[in-house]
């Protein structure tokens, strides 16, 4: 052993210092009737630079907003000295929690005294198992530990084993209600796990009578139009293709206001018993909306699914991966985007709780869901980790904007060209004697349109571009000048084909 000493280990990421630019600016929208302590009905949106910021605003993993399930055991017969009572609770994944064993002792001559002794044993172990108990005239009320939500409400999780003539009546757990804050915390945590230097706006809005998704406009306006992607978590009603059409309409309105962004839609599919019955989205034109149906299968996300009864999805991880990517990069890029940290998202599931290891989840099914334009996690033979199948949009594969990276790239180009051309708006245009645009005017306008596109080329976000202005435009009559911009994208190696075989010689 080394000599005694005091050492320091410097952490990183705690300050949440953001990156330059705004490509990583993101948002999450939740719907709920109750708000964390840092929010109010007049302040439903907050800006976070780290998970610590969110926790300071009341989004903590303390289950303070949870209603813990409670069950009871009424002692009806005190039995004889030496009789025993053992109480156990079965938790998620079959974990059995032993709350202790009571042995009847002399002097405990009433049901109240016996119940008090059992309560004392349970409460003595609270620091270990988290359960608490109380006694009212021989009725022992057992309160679940934090974090179990609705899980204990069904089945027969409490078991009581007695030896001897001691007797009682068992009532199973009821009335557990899950923590919404735990869901918020999970997705925010996952976002910053994938993009530690991200900027995240979080809005928690009242559950509407009918969804219009106007909250996208609200949060984008709050952020002065800087948000590039928004994740929408909707668990109060089921996944609906019509939602994505409504979201697309809001996104188009934002684009018209020079505040373009894309959306990731994560809704409740817990009631979908057969994942193959999901709707084919190729027939829709919601090209700026990406539907996320994946979920962690054995860690925090999976536990939240069991304790809430709601689809949790990998919305936070997907949003974070997109924020970490350059605008042209696919979040399916194997070299860069391993979504698993070895625990979270290591075991894969769909957001209806069905594990990928289930016999029904075949390669043919995964291919079909990919072709149906859904986003989920997958594995590769010989490669550790978990990876998104792609950033599919809810539209036909033939659409120019069939993937989120297509949209993010063109939106960045639009923002850049807009900002550089804006000084020329309502400015004078020098014309030739025949009313056509002069060479000087064309050169000036082209010079305005190009700087941000040049930077995108240098940053390998686009391959090339061209700017064209028709000199014969009738500007005097129309008051409008058309500047055409053509962009050559960066490619994405979605498929790699390798012809291979033997030969007698190499040519």
Residue map of PLM features:
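Short, hydrophobic/π-rich interface segment
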Residues: 439-463
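Long, internal scaffold/assembly segments composed of regular secondary structure
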Residues: 278-286, 290, 297-330, 334-336
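Short hydrophobic beta-strand segments
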Residues: 26-32, 228-233, 466-470
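Polar low-complexity, Ser/Thr/Gly/Ala/Asp/Asn-rich disordered segments used for subunit assembly
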Residues: 1-24, 51-96, 101-300
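Catalytic cores of large soluble enzymes that bind and process phosphate-bearing ligands
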Residues: 46, 110, 239-245, 405, ...
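Long, contiguous, structured domain-core segments that constitute the functional module of a protein
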Residues: 319-441, 484-507
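Compositionally biased, low-complexity/repeat regions
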Residues: 203-205, 462, 466-507
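N-terminal alpha-helical "arm" segments
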Residues: 1-45, 504-507
């Amino acid at each position: 052993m080394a000599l005694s000493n005091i050492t320091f280990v410097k952490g990183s990421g705690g300050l949440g210092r953001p990156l330059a630019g705004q490509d990583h600016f993101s948002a999450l929208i939740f719907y709920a009737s109750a708000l964390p302590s840092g929010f109010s009905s007049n302040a439903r949106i907050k800006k976070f630079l780290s998970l610590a910021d969110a926790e300071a605003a009341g989004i903590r993993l303390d289950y303070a907003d949870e209603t813990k399930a409670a069950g009871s055991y009424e002692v009806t017969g005190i039995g004889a000295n030496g009789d025993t009572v053992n109480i156990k609770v079965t938790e998620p994944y079959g974990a059995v929690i032993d709350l202790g064993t009571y042995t009847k002792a002399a002097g405990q001559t009433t049901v109240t005294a016996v119940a008090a002794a059992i309560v004392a044993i349970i409460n003595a172990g609270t620091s270990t198992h988290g359960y608490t108990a109380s006694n009212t005239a021989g009725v022992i009320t057992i309160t679940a530990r934090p974090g179990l939500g609705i899980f204990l409400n069904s089945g027969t999780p409490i078991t009581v084993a007695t030896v001897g003539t001691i007797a009682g009546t068992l009532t199973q757990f009821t009335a557990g209600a899950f923590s919404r804050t735990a869901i918020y915390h999970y997705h925010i945590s996952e976002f910053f796990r994938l993009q530690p230097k991200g900027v995240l706006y979080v809005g928690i809005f009242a559950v509407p009578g009918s969804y219009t998704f106007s909250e996208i406009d609200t949060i984008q306006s709050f952020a002065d139009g800087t948000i590039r992607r928004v994740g929408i978590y909707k668990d109060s009603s089921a996944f609906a293709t019509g939602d994505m059409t409504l979201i697309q309409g809001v996104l188009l309105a934002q684009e018209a206001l020079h505040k373009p962004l894309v959306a990731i839609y994560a809704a409740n599919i817990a009631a979908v018993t057969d994942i193959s019955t999901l709707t084919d989205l190729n027939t829709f034109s919601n090209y700026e909306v990406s539907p996320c149906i994946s979920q962690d299968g054995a860690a925090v996300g999976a536990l939240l699914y069991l304790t809430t009864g709601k689809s949790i999805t990998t919305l936070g991880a997907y949003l974070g991966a997109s924020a970490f990517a350059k605008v042209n990069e696919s979040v399916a890029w194997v070299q860069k985007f391993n979504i698993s940290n070895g625990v979270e998202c290591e075991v894969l599931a769909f957001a209806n709780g069905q594990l990928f290891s289930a016999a029904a989840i075949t390669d043919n099914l995964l291919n079909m869901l990919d072709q149906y334009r859904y986003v989920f996690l997958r594995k590769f033979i010989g490669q550790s980790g978990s990876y998104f199948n792609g950033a599919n949009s809810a539209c036909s594969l033939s659409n120019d904007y069939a993937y989120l990276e297509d949209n993010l790239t063109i939106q960045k180009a639009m923002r850049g060209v807009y900002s550089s051309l804006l000084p020329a708006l309502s400015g004078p245009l020098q014309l030739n004697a025949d009313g056509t645009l002069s060479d000087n005017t064309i050169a000036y306008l082209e010079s305005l349109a190009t700087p941000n596109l040049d930077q995108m080329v240098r940053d390998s976000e686009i391959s090339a571009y061209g700017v064209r202005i028709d000199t014969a435009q009738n500007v005097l009559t129309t008051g409008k000048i058309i500047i055409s911009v053509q962009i050559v994208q960066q490619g994405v190696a979605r498929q790699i084909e390798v012809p291979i075989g033997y030969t007698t010689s190499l040519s």
